[in-house]
A protein has these predicted regions:
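Short acidic-hydrophobic, aromatic-tinged amphipathic segments that line or gate anion-handling sites
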Residues: 181-182
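Active-site proximal beta-strand in glycosyltransferases
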Residues: 1-7
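Nucleotide-sugar donor-binding catalytic core of glycosyltransferases
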Residues: 9-178
């Protein structure tokens, strides 16, 4: 099972793909969090299977839909869980989308954005405390939208009962009914 998505355009794409291919001759089946349809690899296609990022009820057990809301939309940007803080002089294409979204909202939407505008990412309970204050959350993964590819943040958002918006090109509508995901 490999949790990091394998999407061309993600800064870790080559490293992630190399890791998957490393022991190809020893592995019978792969379970990854990206659609096998979009992966170009030396691994035989029949060995690659999609496995959505699981929600663990021991971790994602919040009923955030019950909490008082101060914000309309939550978004959190980070350079990856292993970094803790944003890298200096880093560039992330998602920031352009967020800037445009905020501009187009004409101050009619109250945003809670972590990882931009001088606000460092938050983790664990600090992250949950921020998330539960918003009516909805936006799930944008690095590398752009690709079929079924998402960071593990999708489990945190949906598993804690937050209405989640995701790019339609990720095709999660294959798994959810209308009204369950935006």
């Amino acid at each position: 099972w490999y949790e990091d998505h394998v999407v061309k355009g993600d800064p870790n794409y080559k490293k992630n793909l190399d890791l998957l291919e490393q022991n190809n001759d020893l592995i019978d089946q792969y379970f990854i969090t990206t659609s096998p349809d979009v992966i170009k690899s030396k691994i035989t296609k029949s060995k690659i299977n999609f496995l959505p990022i699981p929600v663990d009820p021991n971790i994602e057990n919040g009923h955030f839909y019950e909490s008082k809301k101060e914000n309309d939309l939550f978004f959190a940007l980070s350079n990856g869980v292993n970094y803790g803080k944003l890298k200096k002089n880093s560039h992330d294409e998602r920031s352009f989308f967020i800037n445009k979204l905020i501009s187009l909202s004409n101050d009619k939407i109250k945003f809670n954005v972590l990882g931009l505008y001088g606000e460092q990412p938050k983790w664990n309970y600090d992250f949950y405390d921020e998330l539960m204050l918003s009516k909805t959350a936006l799930n944008l993964s690095r590398g752009g939208p690709n079929k079924y590819a998402s960071s593990n943040r999708i489990a945190t958002l949906i598993g804690n009962g937050v209405l989640t918006a995701i790019d339609e090109n990720v095709q999660y509508q294959d798994f959810f009914n209308n009204g369950e995901i935006i």
